[in-house]
Amino acid sequence: MSDAHMETVHVIVKGKVQGVGYRHAAVRRAHMLGVTGWVQNLPDGTVEAVVQGTADQVDHMLEWLRRGPPAAQVRELASERSFEEKRYKHFAQL
């Protein structure tokens, strides 16, 4: 994938998103969509992620992150597109 077509988005997800398999499901979905980056729980009960891929891949991942797995209850998703020199090789749960 050309760097010119690579997008990076930083995401914070709020709601009932810890203890419901959100990160594990996010990794599975990321692999299905072909995006790279990472996802982790934060001490305040939110989930943080960085998603990298084409605009279409990133948009599809953001759409999924807004819903999450069946047990999750996403209340809010904040995302910010950013420029990042680092290129991730895969999508990991931190």
Swiss-Prot record:
Covalent S-S links between cysteines: none
An example Gene Ontology molecular-function term: acylphosphatase activity
Domain of life: Bacteria
Pfam family, one: Acylphosphatase
Location of the active site: R23, N41
Keywords: Hydrolase
InterPro entries, per the entry: Acylphosphatase, Acylphosphatase-like_dom, Acylphosphatase-like_dom_sf, Acylphosphatase_CS
Domain Acylphosphatase-like stretches: 8-94
Coiled-coil annotated spans: none
Reactions listed under catalytic activity: an acyl phosphate + H2O = a carboxylate + phosphate + H(+)
SUPFAM superfamilies: Acylphosphatase/BLUF domain-like (SSF54975)
EC number, UniProt record: 3.6.1.7
NCBIfam families membership: PRK14424.1 (NF010998)
Protein family (similarity comment): Belongs to the acylphosphatase family.
The protein, known as: Acylphosphatase
Gene: acyP
